Amino acid sequence: MITIRDVARQAGVSVATVSRVLNNSALVSPDTRDAVMQAVTLLGYRPNANAQALATQVSDTIGVVVMDVSDAFFGALVKAVDLVAQQHQKYVLIGNSYHEAEKERHAIEVLIRQRCNALIVHSKALTDRELSDFMDQIPGMVLINRIVPGYAHRCVCLDNVSGARMATRMLLNNGHQRIGYLASSHRIEDDAMRREGWLHALQEQGIAASESWIGTGTPDMQGGESAMVELLGRNLQLTAVFAYNDNMAAGALTALKDNGIAIPLHLSVIGFDDIPIARYTDPQLTTVRYPIASMAKIATELALQGAAGTLDITATHCFMPTLVRRHSVAWRQNAVLITN
């Protein structure tokens, strides 16, 4: 598929210049316009009609693409976007993608057709190339929890590796060495980075984690429960587990209680995200806070600035997670044989 970037390369101009030509901007010289249109004809490029429509209209809607708005984490993201939208007298339209490339692509395209010239996109399935093509066409498109090279000023991210290392170090500092990881079955960057942080923290202490220390499930309570049961069935004598997210950690607590294992007396559990459920589990969940509301607010402001052409292209927006100490982690007791 021929993209706007291919046209820019053929004409020897920037993507922004091609966009101005295609949108009939007066800020382009006749020679440049001719060069661009010759490249368009030569390559057979077909401009995105949706993007062209957005370039000539002011929109009162902001689009958001998330994995699943019914998930508490993504619900918090959307709520934060809506708070900023209301301050700017705008409305929010939402697309669910379920971490599937085709659904992510379709959600973005639908929101563009709905005249959303500011988009906040949580994308895990589309390639960097496809996302950058969308971002070239839509100046108000911002990514959250994803960095695409060359577009860092339009990306809002979290240091997942540091967050996972922080969680694992807390367990290590409480005397734990045999620390399991409850991994997400969704093959996305977040899980890979959290697994990396867990491994690095263990390696720093000379601990070689076995693949058998990893239980895998869907990133929800049911998945956490099944992943914990998987680990229990291996009789690994783990004394602590770090979960991919709080939902999985909550599911793990259920599995442990069902097997008569006291938390944190016999086994410590730490989560990631600090969604509301973390305060209401029994015991309350020690976790790593993902500042998703703050990140979503920044992303929305950036999207509006991008749509208005006022973005600072030198800025970067990477957040650090913080540790939230509650009651699911304690000093390691003598390891007990865990049976299913």
Swiss-Prot record:
GO terms for molecular function: DNA-binding transcription factor activity; transcription cis-regulatory region binding. Repressor of the mgl operon. Binds galactose and D-fucose as inducers. GalS binds to an operator DNA sequence within its own coding sequence. SMART domains: HTH_LACI (SM00354). It comes from the Bacteria. The gene is galS. CDD domains: HTH_LacI, PBP1_GalS-like. Signal peptide: none annotated. Gene3D superfamilies: 3.40.50.2300, lambda repressor-like DNA-binding domains. Keywords: DNA-binding, Repressor, Transcription, Transcription regulation. One of its GO terms (biological process) is regulation of DNA-templated transcription. Homodimer. PANTHER family: HTH-TYPE TRANSCRIPTIONAL REGULATOR GALS, LACI-RELATED TRANSCRIPTIONAL REPRESSOR. Residues 1-56 form the HTH lacI-type domain. InterPro entries: HTH_LacI, LacI/GalR-like_sensor, Lambda_DNA-bd_dom_sf, Peripla_BP_I. It comes from Salmonella typhimurium (strain LT2 / SGSC1412 / ATCC 700720). It holds the Pfam family LacI. Residues 4-23 bind DNA. PROSITE patterns: HTH_LACI_1, HTH_LACI_2. This is HTH-type transcriptional regulator GalS.
